[in-house]
Amino acid sequence: MTQAKLETEVSKYMSYVLRHAPEAAGLTLDAEGWVSFDELEKALTSKYDVSRADIIEIVENNPKNRFTIVDNRIRANQGHSVDVDLALTPVEPPAALYHGTSSANWHSIEREGLKKMQRHHVHLSADVETAKIVATRRKGEYLILRVDAARMFSEGHSFFVSDNGVWLAESVPVQYLSPDAGTP
């Protein structure tokens, strides 16, 4: 396996255990999603041929900044399906935010809005380009939705920003959504 493939595989496994199944690696997350870096290192080095320095490099070079290391603890920045409280503070959003998805999802979204599904929040992007990157990870045609974040916020909905800059909301009701002109 090439070094690049190994790094990708380790990063995906880290996302899996830090966001969805810590028990798969024998880990226990605290209430805010943190785990000892030493414990994660032990789990990763028993499964992969990586060193502590390799793991730190994977975290630091992750293009999506999925992880944060503080005081020998590590956590995923968002996207959890396990019960954690990321201790996020509500903030005022920009006027518009964006959500990239598969066009096949539009019929359900136009009836029900955006739901968090198995996650703690709906993930939103600050710009069309980022939403497009998210949307094109899925197969088939994609759709970029514009969220009227200013109106949503003024009507009492909360927004948060994760440590890696992803905007988060509990849900996005349909009245705040419109297909964006950036959609093909």
Swiss-Prot record:
InterPro entries linked:
Ptrans_KptA/Tpt1, RNA_2'-PTrans_C, RNA_2'-PTrans_KptA, RNA_2'-PTrans_N
Q: Which UniProt keywords apply?
A: NAD, Transferase
Pfam families, alphabetically? PTS_2-RNA
- Provide the E.C. number(s) assigned to this enzyme: 2.7.1.-
Q: Which domain of life is it from?
A: Bacteria
**Iron recorded as keyword:** no
Family annotation (SUPFAM superfamilies)? ADP-ribosylation (SSF56399)
In alphabetical order, the GO MF annotations are: NAD+ poly-ADP-ribosyltransferase activity; tRNA 2'-phosphotransferase activity
- Major enzyme class: transferase
Biological process terms from the Gene Ontology for this record are:
tRNA splicing, via endonucleolytic cleavage and ligation
| Protein family per UniProt | Belongs to the KptA/TPT1 family.
Q: Per its database record, what is this protein's job? A: Removes the 2'-phosphate from RNA via an intermediate in which the phosphate is ADP-ribosylated by NAD followed by a presumed transesterification to release the RNA and generate ADP-ribose 1''-2''-cyclic phosphate (APPR>P). May function as an ADP-ribosylase.
Q: What is this protein called?
A: Probable RNA 2'-phosphotransferase
